[in-house]
């Protein structure tokens, strides 16, 4: 068929347009495919990012849980070290401080300015010393105490009391013993008793009872001065302790607990890991040690957060605050767990001094009463308010009554101590921080004794029975040293602690 010459150009144009349309359609299909491919890639990337974020959040949350447990676990060891630093950062013994390996002989009771240890007592004169057993043992000599009540509990780095020479256990005669560290083996001089410590760090926290009079202080000072400590290599030789080395970087003013609580997670766990090199965990701590390893805390090794997943480090950084809250909450939660008993607003425990794997219990005692004894030596009933929910308020007045013949049953001594909310003494015009069996109380007509707990004096005629309180929140702590184990006894429940009642 012959095409009209005029139609030929049109046909060619139409063919060209058809070809162009076909090419355009092909390009559109390619573009759509690319867009779809990019969208799929974006969705995949977002999904992967979300998965990574979810995984990071999971790691962070898991690390927070583990780090919180680790913080609680290590709290006693870190607190012991911070306490040691402050108490030994002097050239010579002075006041409540002294170099490593030298006795610190408290000549009077602590006062309201004392901030080295929480919950100090005003019943005994402390005779204490810090020892590093990593190089060699130390030998301690104690004079004849002439029947006076005393005890020399030794705390390892984790605050467990591993030995308690004293009137209850070894009598009051002269005695000599050696404190040896982990892994030490060798011979000791004849007549020297060995007390083996599980850790290189040891705090001998001796207490000698005193009535607080000038005459009795003098008698106790004479006994303190006869107590000696020498390294094994110097036994039987003339020995003069070297002056301590003062580190100006150590904060000597801020309370230990406050310093510990202010440590960030990185500093805290680095210190914990360093201390664990010479203060190894107990065998029973194996499950906890395995948990610590998951967040880079391994006994004998440095803690290096740069080797950890950033999400883990982020989770660990959040641990201090919830851990501190858990520790303080244990005063109430421990009642449910059976670690504390509650009577008439008083909480007390017979699970102190040795803790096993009760890490929260150990941390709480460290926080509010570092240096606590075994229950056979002392029980510390504590009350933060009439019912453990409502707090004591210094703007109000309270009375604690002992019925006739119902003062605390002990073979040692008892006392009632006033603390502020941070467990330190309260400044007052009488410089009185405790009431105890050494006080001459005014009795009621029926033979009972009322103790007045308030900020203002109850009147001159009642001041003998007055325990001064601050104007705000406060805490009461009783001490029953060498508590009776047979009726009447706090231990078996045959004696009850009187309640503290608010009065108008």
Name these PLM-found stretches.
Residues 35-504:
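A compositional/structural signature for long, glycine/proline-rich flexible linkers
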Residues 2-11:
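Bacterial N-terminal signal peptides that target proteins for export
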Residues 23-26:
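Bacterial signal peptide processing site
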């Amino acid at each position: 068929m012959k095409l009209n010459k005029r139609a030929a150009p049109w046909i060619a144009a139409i063919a060209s347009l058809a070809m162009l349309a076909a090419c355009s359609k092909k390009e559109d299909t390619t573009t759509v495919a690319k867009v779809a491919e990019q969208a799929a890639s974006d969705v995949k990337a977002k999904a992967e990012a979300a998965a990574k974020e979810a995984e990071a959040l999971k790691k962070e949350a898991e690390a927070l849980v583990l780090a919180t447990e680790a913080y609680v676990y290590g709290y006693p060891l870190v607190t012991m070290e911070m306490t040691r630093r402050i108490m030994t950062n002097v050239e010579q013994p002075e006041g409540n401080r002294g170099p490593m390996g030298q006795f610190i002989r408290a000549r009077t009771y602590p006062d309201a300015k004392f901030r080295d240890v929480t919950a100090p007592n005003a019943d005994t004169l402390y005779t204490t010393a810090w020892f590093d057993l990593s190089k060699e043992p130390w030998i301690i000599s104690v004079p004849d105490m002439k029947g006076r009540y005393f005890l020399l509990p030794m705390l390892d780095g984790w605050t467990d009391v591993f030995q308690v020479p004293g009137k209850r256990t070894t009598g009051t005669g002269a005695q000599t013993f050696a404190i040896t560290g982990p892994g030490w083996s060798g011979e000791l001089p004849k007549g020297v008793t060995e007390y083996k410590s599980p850790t290189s760090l040891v705090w001998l926290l001796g207490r000698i009872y005193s009535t607080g009079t000038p005459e009795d202080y003098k008698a106790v000072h004479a006994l303190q001065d006869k107590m000696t400590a020498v390294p094994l290599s110097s036994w039987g030789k003339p020995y003069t302790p070297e002056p301590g080395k003062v580190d100006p970087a150590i904060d000597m003013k801020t309370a230990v607990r406050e310093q510990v609580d202010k440590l960030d997670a990185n500093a805290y766990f680095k210190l914990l890991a360093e201390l664990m090199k010479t203060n190894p965990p107990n065998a029973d701590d194996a499950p906890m040690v395995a948990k610590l390893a998951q967040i880079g805390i391994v006994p004998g090794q440095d803690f290096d957060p740069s080797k950890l997943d950033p999400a883990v480090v982020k989770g660990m950084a959040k641990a201090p605050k919830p851990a501190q809250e858990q520790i303080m909450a244990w005063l109430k939660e421990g009642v449910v767990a059976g670690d504390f008993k509650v009577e008439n607003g008083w909480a007390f425990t017979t699970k102190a001094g040795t803790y096993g794997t009760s890490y929260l219990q150990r941390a709480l005692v460290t926080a509010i009463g570092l240096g606590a004894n075994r229950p056979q030596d002392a029980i510390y009933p504590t009350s933060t308010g009439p019912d453990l929910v409502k707090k004591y308020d210094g703007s109000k007045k309270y009375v604690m009554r002992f019925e006739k013949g119902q003062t605390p049953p002990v073979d040692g001594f008892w006392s009632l101590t006033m603390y502020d909310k941070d467990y330190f003494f309260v400044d007052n015009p009488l410089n009185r921080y405790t009431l105890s069996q050494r006080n001459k109380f005014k009795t009621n007509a029926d033979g009972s004794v009322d103790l007045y707990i308030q900020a203002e004096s109850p009147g001159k005629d009642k001041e003998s029975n007055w325990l001064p309180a601050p104007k705000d929140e406060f805490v009461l702590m009783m001490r029953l040293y060498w508590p009776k184990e047979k009726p009447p006894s706090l231990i078996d429940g045959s004696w009850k602690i009187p309640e503290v009642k608010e009065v108008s």
